Amino acid sequence: MKKILVVVDMQKDFVDGVLGTAEAVQIVGNVVEKINSFDGEIIVTYDTHFENYLNTSEGEKLPVEHCIKGTAGWNLDSDVQSALENRKYRTVEKLTFGSVELPAIVGEITKGEEFSVELIGLCTDICVVSNALILKASYPEVSITVDSSCCAGVTPETHNSALTTMKMCQINVI
């Protein structure tokens, strides 16, 4: 069985940048350990915005410029990037919370073989839950897991709410 790890938005702006949190900083070690020990394919997502961010729907609701492509904040956290240095992985630049391309990329990797998917990263309550639900909707019979020790939300409360939502949608939360 193929195993796929989706590392969601472990970018500087979400870890210790303009939208960073203490909880996000605290999970970096767990994320690095997960990447280092994972035996399977890895997909890394990048929240990707441009100079017009504040004029977008998201920018109007969250008027904090972040993950602008080409800026330091768009780059992966340096420890996460180091963990990926010797690994083969695919990247997905997503323009919104969830990637509608992600299921097709998983399909290319698995080519009809049995597989499982594990998601880790930031933010539990926005991009992790969005991508987990997109994958579960696309592959309802596949084991989709979220490792809560490798995730952090905007707040601890919304992190826990997202974990509950995913459990209710038959996503395994460990």
Task: Give a label for each model feature.
Residues 84, 106, 110, 138-139:
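Active-site catalytic pocket residues across diverse enzymes, especially alpha/beta-hydrolases
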Residues 119, 139-141:
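Glycine-enriched alpha-helix->loop->beta-strand junction motifs that scaffold or abut catalytic
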Residues 41-46, 143-150:
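Short internal beta-strands
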Residues 1-91, 112, 160, 164-167:
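Active-site acidic carboxylates
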Residues 20, 65, 120-121, 150-151:
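A generic structural signal for short
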Residues 91-130, 152-174:
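Conserved N-terminal glycine/acidic-rich loop preference
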Residues 30-35, 129-139:
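Histidine-anchored nucleotide/phosphate-binding helix
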